[in-house]
From Swiss-Prot:
<dbReference type="GO" id="GO:0071555">
    <property type="term" value="P:cell wall organization"/>
</dbReference>
<dbReference type="Pfam" id="PF07478">
    <property type="entry name" value="Dala_Dala_lig_C"/>
</dbReference>
<keyword id="KW-0464">Manganese</keyword>
<dbReference type="InterPro" id="IPR005905">
    <property type="entry name" value="D_ala_D_ala"/>
</dbReference>
<dbReference type="GO" id="GO:0008360">
    <property type="term" value="P:regulation of cell shape"/>
</dbReference>
<keyword id="KW-0133">Cell shape</keyword>
<keyword id="KW-0436">Ligase</keyword>
<keyword id="KW-0067">ATP-binding</keyword>
<dbReference type="InterPro" id="IPR016185">
    <property type="entry name" value="PreATP-grasp_dom_sf"/>
</dbReference>
<keyword id="KW-0479">Metal-binding</keyword>
<dbReference type="InterPro" id="IPR013815">
    <property type="entry name" value="ATP_grasp_subdomain_1"/>
</dbReference>
<feature type="binding site">
    <location>
        <position position="270"/>
    </location>
    <ligand>
        <name>Mg(2+) 1</name>
    </ligand>
</feature>
<dbReference type="InterPro" id="IPR011761">
    <property type="entry name" value="ATP-grasp"/>
</dbReference>
<dbReference type="GO" id="GO:0008716">
    <property type="term" value="F:D-alanine-D-alanine ligase activity"/>
</dbReference>
<keyword id="KW-0961">Cell wall biogenesis/degradation</keyword>
<feature type="binding site">
    <location>
        <position position="272"/>
    </location>
    <ligand>
        <name>Mg(2+) 2</name>
    </ligand>
</feature>
<dbReference type="GO" id="GO:0046872">
    <property type="term" value="F:metal ion binding"/>
</dbReference>
Length: 316
């Protein structure tokens, strides 16, 4: 099967705040595909142009980019125009999932549980937000990943600095109710009715601080896969993950992040349509739990590469 993929581009690097993580993901995917006999080539979208991409002769591409210009629908739209099959979700699902505000609105429309939130701008009276959402609360830029720009606000006096940090990345800032509980994540593979959740992972970071450093570079963070949950709770979390994935129109693969509260109720936090594929990443961990190696996972994702926008039949 590997030879049938033809010449494959592994798109990595890019220009987002998550470039460093993407470089690690891309190199890992590239090595795995080579080991599986795939004619794979690295392509850094932060250093090369779309014209270079069009001229490279790739028959399909594996998107190992994270954040803006790689995970937000812009690249996916360009690949649709170029007619190059690609991994993961299409332009619309990628755009919706990258925007944490729109993600939450879609989930609420589908009756899915997500913490209460407000959208903050320059005219917002910051001192009133904790009265509505409670303390502590979370402030984050809606278009960044890997915990970039996120602050857990403990008191009224922290609001201004937290807002200014998040506003460095976005014109709007997402304020979100803080739910005390266990941090979980669920990988989903496939599309449509065939999409299935992999085993639930629990993340336990030192001091409960699962930040950029603990995500990608620390050996102190603990991961439990499958998570130690009652069978009915694990099944409920997996079902909510599949519904959340479907509600946004995701395809191919993705990862859904949760908080499980003290009553074992899952609360949806974020959708990742191009999750990390580093040595510390969670989708490969979940795949291993069902007997799928890192290389097998990469090949399975690549096998589903496609253009997602369906052109209407021409009327001549």
């Amino acid at each position: 099967m590997s030879k049938q993929f033809g010449k494959v581009g592994v798109l990595y690097g890019g220009r987002s705040a998550e470039r460093e993580v993407s470089l690690m993901s891309g190199k890992g995917v590239h090595e795995a595909l080579l080991s599986a006999g795939v004619d794979a080539h690295l392509f850094d979208t932060g250093e090369r142009s779309l014209a270079d991409l069009a001229a490279a002769g790739f028959e399909r591409v594996f998107i190992a980019l994270h954040g803006r210009y790689g995970e937000d629908g812009t690249l996916q739209g360009a690949l649709e125009l170029l007619g190059i099959p690609y991994t993961g979700s299409g332009p619309l699902a990628s755009s919706l999932s990258m925007d944490k505000i729109m993600t939450k609105r879609v989930w609420l429309q589908h009756g899915l549980p997500t913490p209460a939130f407000e959208v903050l701008g320059g005219s917002t009276e910051l001192r009133l937000v904790p009265d509505r959402l409670g303390l502590p609360l979370i402030l984050k830029p809606p278009h960044e990943g890997s915990t970039v720009g996120i602050t857990k606000v403990a008191g009224y006096s922290d609001m201004k600095a937290a807002y200014e940090l998040a506003a460095r990345f976005d014109a709007e800032v997402l304020a979100e109710q803080f739910i005390t509980g266990r941090e979980l994540t669920v990988a989903v593979l496939g599309s449509g009715a065939a999409a299935r959740a992999l085993p639930v992972i629990e993340i336990v970071a030192p001091g409960g601080n699962y930040d950029y450093e603990h995500k990608y570079f620390s050996d102190d963070t603990q991961y439990f896969c499958p998570a130690d949950l009652p069978a009915d709770v694990a099944a409920d979390v997996a079902a909510v993950a599949e519904r959340a994935y479907a509600a946004l129109g995701c395809e191919g693969w993705g990862r859904v992040d949760f908080i499980l509260d003290r009553e074992n109720r899952p609360w949806l936090l974020e959708m990742n349509t191009s999750p990390g594929m580093t040595g510390h990443s969670l989708v490969p961990m979940a795949a291993r739990a069902v007997g799928m190696s890192y290389a097998d996972l990469c090949v399975a994702i690549l096998a589903k590469a496609a253009c997602k926008v369906r052109s209407p039949a021409r009327q001549d």
